[in-house]
Amino acid sequence: NYRAVTRMTAQRVAEMVELIRGETPLAQWPQEWFAVADNIRRKDLLLGNTLVPGEALEVALARGAAATLEEVRRSGLRGRGGAGFATGQKWQACRDAPGAMHYVVCNADEGEPGTFKDRVLLSAYADLVFEGMTIAGYAIGAAQGLLYLRGEYRYLLEALEQTLQRRRNQGLLGVEIMGVKGFDFDIEIHLGAGAYICGEESALIESLEGKAGRPRIRPPFPVTHGYLGQPTTVNNVETLAAACLVARHGGAWYAAIGTAKSAGTKLLSISGDCQRPGIYEYPFGIGVAQLLADCGAASSTQAVQVSGPSGVCL
């Protein structure tokens, strides 16, 4: 049934077994069992934003595609999926690449153990993500966006589809968006099937095309030969959400936050032996000591594992 059940205990498992044996319809199960908490502990620029749907897009459309892309370059925004590649540089390369079609792909295949920031953005800030995809489409000259949703996040699908339909009804997706002639853009959601490797962008594109999710030999890169062999920009959920802030407030505003080499803020998924696990948003440059103090792990911590099981211990 693709429903997520949280906060499992021995008692809850026993109760579930009885409901299953009794063939009790899922609709009659306690609905609190299916509640997935966002558990946001600290908000900053992104999680604390007050943008309304269409606000950032309207500014981008008024500025123009080339100027919007320049603001993204000026902002210093880097990919939030791990590689840290300059977003503006990627968008520019995709825009400049020849092709009959250009595509925007949102990588929502959040499979790294211990990471749940993208899930929170998709459940509580979906408008921001979809608007970021639309702005990216405008900047690179794409008419189609594809969100590749992790198979384990299928329970989010209905709400995400409802958000997309609302945006279409509001004129924020579809034909001649916000009355701009020639700017047509829409978004489809594709479900993954649980393969960890599909978090890698070329394997993700293979999966989108209906093939086995295996990484491609590179070069060529997706920005020139991506989805269906066409120029494609693949960006992380958080990257696209942050692009909305850049579009709305400008590159210089965003670049002034964080550090000289890493602009803006970052969402951190904090879990393990701490009193307050959850999502924390900080400007780049924060020290580990402050993070430990904020999450309630400052007194007895011996090591901090960074980047999940495949990362390192500090």
State what each model feature region is.
Residues 1-314:
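Feature of Fe-S/electron-transfer and energy-metabolism proteins
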